[in-house]
Amino acid sequence: MMGFGASALESIEGEEALEVPGPPPEPRAPEPRAPEPEPGLDLSLSPSPLPESPKARKSSPGQRKGRRGGSRRGRQVRFQLAPPSPVRSEPLLVAGAPGDDHELEAPALQSSLALSLELQNARAAVASGQFDASKAVEEQLRKSFRTRCALEETVAEGLNVPRSKRLYRDLVSLQVPEEQVLNAALREKLAMLPPQPRAPPLKEVLGPGPDMTMLCNPDSLWSESPHLTVDGLPPLRLQARPRPSEDTFLMHRMLRRWEA
């Protein structure tokens, strides 16, 4: 039993001796890095040695020996983002520093800074005894928007201008009659239609005219014939003359009337 216990103790001590981790692998020499970009745009990667996990320490001795032998070849590399470059901190401008241009503190129209400046001037005038109350009231009334509106109302009443025109001068009436809206829509639709051909105006119907042979006898008329040469007259050239379309129907009506 003692021998068996001694052998077991020796085997346990041997395992503990094997489980003692060796020195960590030496990191590579730092390579020259590229210039760091601006913060927010840094996408560079830097290698870092993989820390040994606690599970690797409890692994079998055979596996640990194999890892020690091939640590240089199969070592894992973890990449992480480079830390952002330090931003240059500019010294803040002191509010009360003399000789500085405070562009943001310039009093503007209708601003709280302008009102505070006027209040400070009024307090300084009261403290020095140069404050004129009547003049201040007159100046305020001259600048007041309410006073100007009330004055315009009074002038408009004196000129007999209706109150509706003074209040709603540039507004559009929303109570439009339905008939007016329909007429406007109908006019728009008609304007989009092509123009219709217009019918010719009706001519006045003429009555029966006088008889042309009332004062003459056709049998007593003399006829003249031209003295032609051997060649005779040159052949006439026929030329078409454009006539309006309504002349055809007018001629037809006249012939029917004469036949009757």
Curated annotation (Swiss-Prot):
Its main location: cytoplasm. InterPro entries: PPP1R35, PPP1R35_C. Residues 64-76 have a biased composition (Basic residues). One of its GO terms (molecular function) is phosphatase binding. It comes from the Eukaryota. GO terms for cellular component: centriole; centrosome; cytoplasm. Keywords: Cytoplasm, Cytoskeleton, Phosphoprotein, Protein phosphatase inhibitor. It is found in: Cytoplasm, Cytoskeleton, Microtubule organizing center, Centrosome; Cytoplasm, Cytoskeleton, Microtubule organizing center, Centrosome, Centriole. Disruption phenotype: Mice homozygous embryos for the Ppp1r35 gene are lethal during early embryogenesis. Homozygous embryos are capable of initiating and completing gastrulation as well as specifying the anterior/posterior and the dorsal/ventral axis, but exhibit a developmental delays which are the result in the failure to progress past 8.5 dpc to 9.0 dpc. Disulfide bonds: none annotated. The modification Phosphoserine is found at S46, S53. Residues 1-100 are annotated as: Disordered. One of its GO terms (biological process) is positive regulation of centriole elongation. Belongs to the PPP1R35 family. During centriole duplication, plays a role in the centriole elongation by promoting the recruitment of the microtubule-binding elongation machinery through its interaction with TTTN, leading to the centriole to centrosome conversion. In addition may play a role in the primary cilia assembly. PANTHER family: PROTEIN PHOSPHATASE 1 REGULATORY SUBUNIT 35 (PTHR28625:SF1). Interacts with PPP1CA; this interaction mediates the PPP1CA phosphatase activity inhibition. Interacts with RTTN; this interaction allows the mutual recruitment to the centriole. This is Protein phosphatase 1 regulatory subunit 35. It comes from Mus musculus.
